Regions:
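Non-heme di-metal
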Residues: 1-177
């Protein structure tokens, strides 16, 4: 039987969206509870949010939406492109027409962020496709994301000499201060 175009596929998409939204709402609710001094209630909201995340993942997998990293990066870039070129542009225009100038400006601001997200995903995709995630053409400072070990080289170590974590834990060190 074919899932594509079925009522079950539509139900899976609705379930995924609902569980995803619930997860975010409960995370926000936890923040409020914590600020108001209700640690236990905050923890329960967070625990439930984690449950909702797993429910969403289950439905997302059933939809066949989880690919390999390159496929996921491309999918993410395409989604971000839609958000900044179409969705938020339309939302900003409509908000402006209805007199919600502050919201229109926020939609445009988020659109600019979504554009940067698309660019980041496309750069990461290029790195994956060109096998440049852990190897660069020039001397680069690499940092182990687990223990903080720093090493200079054109390639990240196969294994961290300090904590023995694999190469996958290394990233190009970037300072922003």
């Amino acid at each position: 039987m074919e899932l594509k175009g079925s009522k079950t596929e539509k139900n899976l998409m609705t379930a995924f969206a609902g569980e995803s939204q619930a997860r975010n709402k409960y995370t926000y609710f936890a923040s409020v509870a914590k600020k108001e001094g209700y640690e236990q209630i905050a923890a329960i909201f967070l625990k439930t949010a984690d449950n909702e995340k797993e429910h969403a993942k289950m439905w997302f997998k059933a939809l066949g939406e989880l690919g390999n990293t390159a496929e996921n990066l491309l999918h993410a870039a395409e989604d971000e492109n839609y958000e900044w070129t179409d969705m938020y542009a339309t939302f900003a225009k409509e908000a402006e027409e209805e007199g919600f100038t502050k919201l229109a400006a926020q939609f445009r601001g988020v659109a600019a962020i979504e554009k940067a997200h698309e660019e980041r995903y496309r750069a990461l995709l290029s790195n994956v496709e060109m096998q440049k995630v852990f190897e660069k053409g020039e001397m680069t400072m690499w940092e182990c994301r687990n223990c903080g070990h720093l090493v200079m080289g054109t390639k990240a170590p196969e294994v961290c000499p300090v904590c023995a974590h694999p190469q996958s834990y290394f990233e190009v060190r970037g300072e922003n201060y």
